[in-house]
């Protein structure tokens, strides 16, 4: 009889990838995935530590799981094994056992490949097992081949960690320094996901364009080199990468956007602020002029390229003038889509120790203003697509009968009404008939 595995994933695409790999790790040991937490034999919370109160949200979720455990005991059922994985696990460590002693395992993002052994020990009645080692090479060497198909679009992690040490960010402390996977390891995984039906691959990294993996004869591959290599795979039709840092956006990578047809015309390039003063305080290692130059060169290389970014408002010391600089940058660049957040102090980061924190109400006001501008830009871009025919990769069914959802080359979600499920995992010409700020509606072009 198979055992049931429930995984709840928080945060970034890297965590989504890690959760898939956890499924693959545990499948040979008899664990099948379930979306019903009540029937799970193992419950894994794969956590994120980027946003404010991330740890408290996990403790709240663990409290709900404790009530579920108590109910199971009342009915004479065995308790599930509870695992806290990911970046909150790395940051909190033993504190998780102190606050929630019913948790069985705490495992960091670089050591979850040990989950089968850790779970086996809990089955043998060992308690409070923790593994927070930072050995990236071991992680990637131990990860299994893909067992669970990811669908039309697949994530592949090629780089982890970050050496930039932005003053607002916990990634270097929870994911470690930059490490790049071996080229052939990535290539084999790409072959596997394509053989399982993927037509698009998203290459993932906390700082993906800093990729410098070893290939044959120890040749070092840049991200551009890796993309060129993967583009040779038959039946792979689209390649993407995220997330990038402006200072690692090389001439070679920019030029590749003009010549590699499989590389999609969409770049997520976080800038965080439009103020040179705030960029310096954030330790971003570039100024707004440098960022503008990168954007201009990308648009010269690929005139139809669409840009996305991340913004943080209310970083310590941010004045009204600094915020206006951010709005000015946004208006000049004109993004296709963006993510924006209020600054939240992360324990252990330099930004958290500053005494010139911005009041919450000011951060909220600025975020509202920025999001209004970004939403307006996103709507304008989507509306500009109405009447055009776009190539859409259909990757999933919608909530309603006969509804299918896909993605354009520019990462827009497209909804069509069509009962033909054979469209899934195919790229089809779609005429766009309607746009909102968040999605497009269309019909098959005939």
UniProtKB/Swiss-Prot annotation:
Domain (MTTase N-terminal) spans 3-124
What InterPro entries does the annotation carry? Elp3/MiaA/NifB-like_rSAM (IPR006638), Methylthiotransferase (IPR005839), Methylthiotransferase_CS (IPR020612), Methylthiotransferase_N (IPR013848), Methylthiotransferase_N_sf (IPR038135), MiaB_methiolase (IPR006463), rSAM (IPR007197), rSAM_horseshoe (IPR023404)
Which EC main class describes this enzyme?
transferase
Subcellular localization, per the record?
Cytoplasm
Q: How is the cofactor bound?
A: Binds 2 [4Fe-4S] clusters. One cluster is coordinated with 3 cysteines and an exchangeable S-adenosyl-L-methionine.
Q: What is its main location?
A: cytoplasm
Any keyword Iron-sulfur?
A: yes
Q: Where does [4Fe-4S] cluster 1 bind?
A: 12, 48, 87
Detail which positions bind [4Fe-4S] cluster 2. 162, 166, 169
Q: Which UniProt keywords apply?
A: 4Fe-4S, Cytoplasm, Iron, Iron-sulfur, Metal-binding, S-adenosyl-L-methionine, Transferase, tRNA processing
GO terms for MF? 4 iron, 4 sulfur cluster binding; metal ion binding; N6-isopentenyladenosine methylthiotransferase activity
Q: Which residues form the Radical SAM core domain?
A: 148-380
Known catalytic reactions: N(6)-dimethylallyladenosine(37) in tRNA + (sulfur carrier)-SH + AH2 + 2 S-adenosyl-L-methionine = 2-methylsulfanyl-N(6)-dimethylallyladenosine(37) in tRNA + (sulfur carrier)-H + 5'-deoxyadenosine + L-methionine + A + S-adenosyl-L-homocysteine + 2 H(+)
Any Gene Ontology CC annotation: cytosol
Quaternary structure note: Monomer.
This molecule's function is given as: Catalyzes the methylthiolation of N6-(dimethylallyl)adenosine (i(6)A), leading to the formation of 2-methylthio-N6-(dimethylallyl)adenosine (ms(2)i(6)A) at position 37 in tRNAs that read codons beginning with uridine.
Mind telling me what this protein is named? tRNA-2-methylthio-N(6)-dimethylallyladenosine synthase
Origin species, per record, is: Rickettsia canadensis (strain McKiel)
């Amino acid at each position: 009889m198979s055992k049931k595995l429930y995984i709840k994933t928080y945060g970034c695409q890297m965590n989504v990838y890690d959760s898939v790999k956890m499924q693959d790790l545990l499948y040979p040991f008899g664990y099948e995935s379930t979306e019903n937490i009540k029937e799970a034999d193992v419950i894994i919370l794969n956590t994120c530590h980027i946003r404010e109160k991330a740890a408290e949200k996990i403790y709240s979720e663990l409290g709900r799981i404790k009530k579920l455990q108590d109910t199971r005991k009342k009915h004479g059922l065995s308790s599930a094994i509870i695992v806290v994985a990911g970046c909150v696990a790395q940051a909190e460590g033993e504190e998780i056992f102190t606050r929630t002693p019913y948790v069985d395992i705490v495992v960091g993002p670089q050591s979850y490949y040990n989950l089968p052994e850790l779970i086996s020990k809990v089955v043998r009645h060992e308690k409070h097992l923790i593994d927070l080692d930072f050995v990236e090479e071991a992680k990637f060497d131990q990860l299994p081949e893909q067992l669970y198909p990811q669908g039309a679009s697949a994530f592949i992690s090629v780089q982890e960690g970050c050496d930039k040490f932005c003053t607002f960010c916990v990634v270097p402390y929870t994911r470690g320094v930059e490490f790049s996977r071996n080229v052939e390891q990535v290539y084999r995984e790409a072959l596997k996901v394509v053989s399982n039906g993927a037509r698009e691959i998203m290459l993932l990294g906390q700082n993906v364009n800093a990729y410098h993996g070893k290939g044959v004869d120890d040749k070092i591959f840049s991200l551009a080199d890796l993309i060129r290599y993967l583009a040779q795979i038959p039946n792979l039709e689209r390649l993407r990468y995220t997330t990038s840092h402006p200072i690692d956006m090389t001439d070679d990578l920019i030029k590749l956007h003009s010549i590699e047809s499989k590389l999609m015309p969409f770049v997520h390039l976080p800038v965080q602020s439009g103020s040179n003063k705030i960029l310096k305080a954030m330790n971003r290692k570039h100024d707004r002029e440098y960022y503008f130059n990168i954007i201009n060169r990308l648009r010269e290389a690929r005139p139809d390229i669409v840009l996305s970014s991340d913004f943080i408002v209310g970083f310590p010391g941010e004045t009204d003038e600094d915020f206006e600089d951010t709005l000015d940058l946004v208006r000049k660049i004109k993004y296709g889509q963006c993510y924006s957040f209020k600054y939240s102090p992360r324990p252990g980061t330099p930004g958290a120790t500053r005494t010139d924190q911005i009041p919450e109400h000011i951060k909220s006001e600025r975020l509202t203003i920025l999001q209004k501008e970004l939403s307006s830009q996103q709507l304008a871009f989507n509306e500009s697509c109405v009447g055009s025919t776009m190539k859409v990769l259909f990757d999933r069914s919608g909530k309603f009968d006969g509804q299918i959802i896909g993605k354009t080359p520019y990462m827009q979600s497209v909804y069509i009404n069509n009962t033909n499920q054979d469209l899934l995992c195919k790229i089809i010409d779609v005429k766009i008939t309607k746009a909102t700020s968040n999605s497009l509606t269309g019909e098959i072009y005939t």
